[in-house]
């Protein structure tokens, strides 16, 4: 949720910078003006963020009861 809020603020700043600095030689480029690549970066960052979470995708490491394995019949 926080990442989406940050992404929204960055896109808002990018759109504001285009309006105010259109006559400037060097503009602030935050990757949003490049079209599809900006969304690709956003998806990659969301994927990395979800992979780092404990309940995210990937192999689940289960703790098991060693006593139950030894005494299983």
UniProtKB/Swiss-Prot annotation:
Is Signal given among the entry's keywords?
A: yes
GO MF term (any one)? diuretic hormone activity
What are the protein's UniProt keywords?
A: Amidation, Cleavage on pair of basic residues, Secreted, Signal
Write down any Gene Ontology CC term. Answer: extracellular space
Q: Which residues carry this modification: Proline amide?
A: 57
- What's an example Gene Ontology biological process for this entry? body fluid secretion
What protein is this chain from?
Venom protein 55.1
């Amino acid at each position: 949720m926080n990442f989406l809020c940050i992404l929204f603020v960055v896109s808002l700043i990018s759109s504001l910078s285009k309006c105010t600095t259109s006559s400037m030689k060097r503009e602030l480029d935050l990757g949003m003006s490049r079209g599809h690549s900006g969304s690709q970066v956003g998806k990659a960052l969301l994927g990395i963020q979800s992979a780092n979470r404990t309940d995210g995708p990937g192999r689940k490491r289960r703790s098991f009861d060693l006593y139950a394995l030894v005494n299983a019949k």
